[in-house]
Amino acid sequence: MAAPRMPPSRLSGIMVPAPIQDLEALRALTALFKEQRNRETAPRTIFQRVLDILKKSTQAVELACRDPSQVEHLASSLQLITECFRCLRNACIECSVNQNSIRNLDTIGVAVDLVLLFRELRVEQDSLLTAFRCGLQFLGNVASRNEDSQSIVWVHAFPELFMSCLNHPDKKIVAYCSMILFTSLNSERMKDLEENLNIAINVIEAHQKHPESEWPFLIITDHFLKSPELVEAMYGKLSNQERVTLLDIMIAKIVGDEQLTKDDISIFLRHAELIANSFVDQCRNVLKLTSEPQTEDKEALVTIRLLDVLCEMTSNTELLGYLQVFPGLMERVIDVLRVIHSVGKDSTNIFSPSDSLKAEGDIEHMTEGFKSHLIRLIGNLCYKNKENQDKVNELDGIPLILDSSNIDDNNPFMMQWVVYAVRNLTEDNSQNQDFIAKMEEQGLADASLLKKMGFEVEKSGDKLILKSNNDIPPP
């Protein structure tokens, strides 16, 4: 392809406003590089010329950083810088030859340095913002599917560029910076993040602030969640709201359309240890909500979300076995269920059964389903596990579960989860079956309630038999 001629922008060694020819030539190149055939035939000399213009224009930005009064004179330089970045950005699209040529000219280092200068300026100018965005887009494109370029971008950009841009007020800059981070990360570079946890935390914050942006979400699902070491190190540093965000993404990964792979399972077993330990240690935080009903206690919300994660993990047969034998987990779940059941019956609070729906955002809405999820988790942990079935009985959990079956708008599907738990508690467990049958005979379990749940007690000689009505499907 024939490149438009670009005359020099210096006369007699004195900096002058950018010649209109330079800008027009760059714009022409940018348009040409939208076509694949033009990208594939571009001579290396073009990229050297673009780099020369970029370097010369950078001098004006450096001057403005040293002398803020010069900012008002940046317009022509910013126009050239923006068009240089657009030109280079387009040249890199699905063209490894151009990516390599541009990288080998050390354009990446110049671009990163310039982007960092933009952050230093801290002035509100649309032209500066546009140049900033285009610079990040170029860095993302030059690194896309090119490991050599990714390495160079990482060397120049980590950690300063990510620290500077992930918390930028402009959501497009955050998105483009996240794209660069996503593109450049690999298993080795994850270790760098472990030593710079603030960057990882900034990604969580970016997802919180901009949930519509796919890049922060993809960084967390495709990189962070594949590193149990990073997740564990980061979890202790996160705010409670950030923990809720991370746990929500973990749930999304577990229940997503794509089934967890064998590698995912081994990683999530490590996550399960963190989640279970955190729940066992912190589950009583949820009780703060009984004394401070008007306060959205963030620690309590973390506990609620930890329970949600455990419910989804124990619904996965490959994760279930590990959690069924996790020390202290069943005991804690029964303990919390007993306390909130007692508190809910003794006084009016957010754990009391309700027959009226709550508005979204109310603290009652935040705790919706907590009690029924405790029972769901008990049912999961008892699935084909006699040791846990017996443990629930020993902890007096069976009467507690049966007494929790009242309709409660705060706990949708409560009856279904009670039925599910009772079935798993009694499957191939004659001792638990006898226990419930005797409760019914002694009036401690309502026969009509048991029938509604799909169970009935029959007398055979001097023995009581608990029978299940298989016509009622599990939840």
Curated annotation (Swiss-Prot):
Instruction: Look up the domain of life of the source.
Output: Eukaryota
Residues recorded with modification Phosphothreonine: T82
Omega-N-methylarginine modification sites? R10
Q: How is it modified after translation?
A: Polyubiquitinated. Phosphorylation at Ser-12 by AURKB promotes the association of ATXN10 with PLK1. Phosphorylation at Ser-77 and Thr-82 by PLK1 may play a role in the regulation of cytokinesis and may stimulate the proteasome-mediated degradation of ATXN10.
Pfam families named among the record's database cross-references: Atx10homo_assoc (PF09759)
- Where does the signal sequence lie? none
Q: What is its main location?
A: cytoplasm
Q: Annotated Gene Ontology MF terms?
A: enzyme binding; identical protein binding
- Tell me the compartments it is located in: Cytoplasm; Cytoplasm, Perinuclear region; Midbody; Cytoplasm, Cytoskeleton, Cilium basal body
Q: Which InterPro entries match?
A: ARM-like (IPR011989), ARM-type_fold (IPR016024), Ataxin-10/CTR86_families (IPR051374), Ataxin-10_domain (IPR019156)
Q: In which tissues is it expressed?
A: Ubiquitous distribution. Markedly increased expression in testis, adrenals, and brain.
Function per UniProt? May play a role in the regulation of cytokinesis. May play a role in signaling by stimulating protein glycosylation. Induces neuritogenesis by activating the Ras-MAP kinase pathway and is necessary for the survival of cerebellar neurons. Does not appear to play a major role in ciliogenesis.
Q: What does the similarity note say?
A: Belongs to the ataxin-10 family.
Q: What is this protein called?
A: Ataxin-10
Quote the gene name from the UniProt entry: Atxn10
